[in-house]
Regions:
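Beta-rich carbohydrate-recognition modules and glycan-binding surfaces
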Residues: 1-173
Length: 173
């Protein structure tokens, strides 16, 4: 059996067409794009032949933000983020200048739903790559959405901005 793995781009977040908001914070959140991709990374050309763009990032603007507010980014009906093969890692670039956040990915598939904690970042100006490597690879999963929980809000007036870029998975056969 081969141990070869490949990284596949699920979304480069150049537009918001594939996503909608859900969860407790959806009514306080606006989804848009911003002319800033993660500058500290070089856009990759992934195993599926898709090249990541770095012109725009997906942005969640949260009004009246407070600690423990949760916003979900879910795939729009008819939009599929199927992961062929065995999921070995999920990665996401994140920048959150106004709040500390915790991010997780929600997966579905033959074996039911599960949530993978991608990680936490403190409020700051820099892009950071979050990721999760499950103990055992997950076969034939679908990425259903991302959950973002604000853990500490440092900006008290206006909207809290959370930027997302290049959602990728590493798969094995």
């Amino acid at each position: 059996m081969s141990d070869a793995s490949v990284e596949v781009l699920l979304d480069d977040f150049e537009n918001k067409d594939k996503w909608e908001l859900a969860g407790d914070g959806a009514g306080r959140t606006h989804l848009t794009t911003f002319a800033e991709g993660a500058p500290s990374k070089t856009p990759g050309v992934y195993a599926d032949g898709v090249a990541g763009e770095d012109h725009r990032a997906l942005v969640l603007l949260v009004k009246s933000a407070e600690a423990d507010l949760e916003v979900e980014l879910v795939a729009k009906p008819g939009q599929s983020f199927s992961i062929a093969g065995r999921l070995a890692m999920v990665n996401l670039w994140v920048r959150s200048p106004h709040a500390s956040i915790r991010v997780s990915a929600r997966l579905g598939g033959e074996h039911g739903e599960r949530e993978l904690a991608l990680g936490s970042i403190g409020a700051g100006p820099d892009w950071q790559r979050l990721g999760h490597e499950p103990a055992d690879a997950i076969a034939d999963a679908d990425l259903q959405g991302l959950r973002i929980r604000l853990t500490d809000v440092v900006k008290r007036e206006g909207e809290v901005m959370i930027l997302l870029d290049d959602l990728t998975v590493r798969t094995t056969v």
